[in-house]
Amino acid sequence: MEITLGIAMFTVIVLALAVLILFAKSKLVNSGDITIEINDDPGKAINLPAGGKLLGALANKGIFVSSACGGGGSCGQCIVKVTEGGGDILPTELSHISKREAKEGYRLSCQVNVKNSMKIELPEEVFGVKKWECTVISNDNKATFIKELKLQIPEGEEVPFRAGGYIQIEAEPHTVHYKDFDIPKEYHEDWDKFDLWRYTSKVDEHIIRAYSMASYPEEKGIIMLNVRIATPPPRNPDVPPGQMSSYIWSLKEGDKVTISGPFGEFFAKETDNEMVFIGGGAGMAPMRSHIFDQLKRLKSKRKMSFWYGARSKREMFYVEDFDMLQAENDNFVWHVALSDPLPEDDWDGYTGFIHNVLYENYLKNHEAPEDCEYYMCGPPVMNAAVIKMLKDLGVEDENILLDDFGG
């Protein structure tokens, strides 16, 4: 009897808790359809079921907000302005959004829960962003850890990007074995030295990452990227390798790849000021895009120079391209500095870190370095060193333009 009574009471308690949870859920979560009004334009409003995050809700309706980290809350790019609804800002957003911006309604769309109807504001250029399924034309090594991925846009389509812009690449769950990579023997030294062939990248979820374009707008029908593979650092070999870079390095001719874009803000100013481009590693990509666009499409007569840092001659690429541009344009020169030239390089050019080379061989004696515009993209250490050097020369922030996607 006591056992039966105990079971009955336990059942009643469980049922009561279930009813309570369902009641609370009905009050706290809107399970019906909601409306997101955009830019006070009735034609842009979208209706959808409640649930999920704002970033994904917009994407499901064909509105693609930039998110280099794929919605993880780490890149801080997916900022939108929420003027009504959306709830309170979360602590995870405050490292990317200032207190003033938070008061004005700015949020990370990947962190905003879609529970109720809301009103938001988006930049108009967002509505020009599209998705394409592209075909891999080639995926060749340009340096030890850098591949040039060349993609074919679907016939009749065009990615209307500006030089310095970027696209996002998507990848479904996958497993990549580094031993399967197609890498020419000339680049094997470091791969063998650190036994990088032993690594495997296993991804169990859909991922998205952003990459700056190396192509420029006149190169119709294709998208070119310079992708540096994110291998585990030698001092910490147990760190997982980069998910998207590993995936991209595994791509072969004929493979299909989904991209979205265009995005960007690393655009050239429309002035007559001198342009100084500074790059390193995969930061070559937006440098090539900008310089080709200025000299080949715009036929610019602005004075410009390009300063690129590499470890050795093996890590130099697009040399013939920039030599050609220099020969064809009196207003353009380019220089390479090797930080660790090999004996067989027989190198008689600049050596050392690129920020020091730029300063000692040009800016130190420049009559007005503060009047130049500086466009840079490279490893974080390079970027920091260049910015400090420019600040010491009195260059204002408005003349220092940085692309954080390279390196």
Curated annotation (Swiss-Prot):
Enzyme class per UniProt: translocase
EC number per UniProt: 7.2.1.1
Keyword Nucleotide-binding listed: no
Catalytic reactions on record: a ubiquinone + n Na(+)(in) + NADH + H(+) = a ubiquinol + n Na(+)(out) + NAD(+)
Cofactor dependence: [2Fe-2S] cluster; FAD
Transmembrane segments: 3-23
GO cellular component: plasma membrane
A GO molecular-function descriptor: metal ion binding
Gene3D superfamilies, per database record: 3.10.20.30, Nucleotide-binding domain of ferredoxin-NADP reductase (FNR) module, Translation factors
InterPro entries: 2Fe-2S_ferredoxin-like_sf, 2Fe-2S_ferredoxin-type, Beta-grasp_dom_sf, Cbr1-like_FAD-bd_dom, FAD-bd_FR_type, Flavoprot_Pyr_Nucl_cyt_Rdtase, FNR_nucleotide-bd, NqrF
Gene Ontology BP terms: sodium ion transport
Protein keywords: 2Fe-2S, Cell inner membrane, Cell membrane, FAD, Flavoprotein, Ion transport, Iron, Iron-sulfur, Membrane, Metal-binding, NAD, Sodium, Sodium transport, Translocase, Transmembrane, Transmembrane helix, Transport, Ubiquinone
CDD domains: fer2 (cd00207), NADH_quinone_reductase (cd06188)
2Fe-2S ferredoxin-type domain sequence ranges: 32-126
Annotated FAD-binding FR-type domain residues: 129-269
Listed HAMAP family: NqrF (MF_00430)
Assembly with partners or alone: Composed of six subunits; NqrA, NqrB, NqrC, NqrD, NqrE and NqrF.
Function: NQR complex catalyzes the reduction of ubiquinone-1 to ubiquinol by two successive reactions, coupled with the transport of Na(+) ions from the cytoplasm to the periplasm. The first step is catalyzed by NqrF, which accepts electrons from NADH and reduces ubiquinone-1 to ubisemiquinone by a one-electron transfer pathway.
Protein name: Na(+)-translocating NADH-quinone reductase subunit F
Annotated source species: Histophilus somni (strain 129Pt) (Haemophilus somnus)
Gene it is expressed from: nqrF
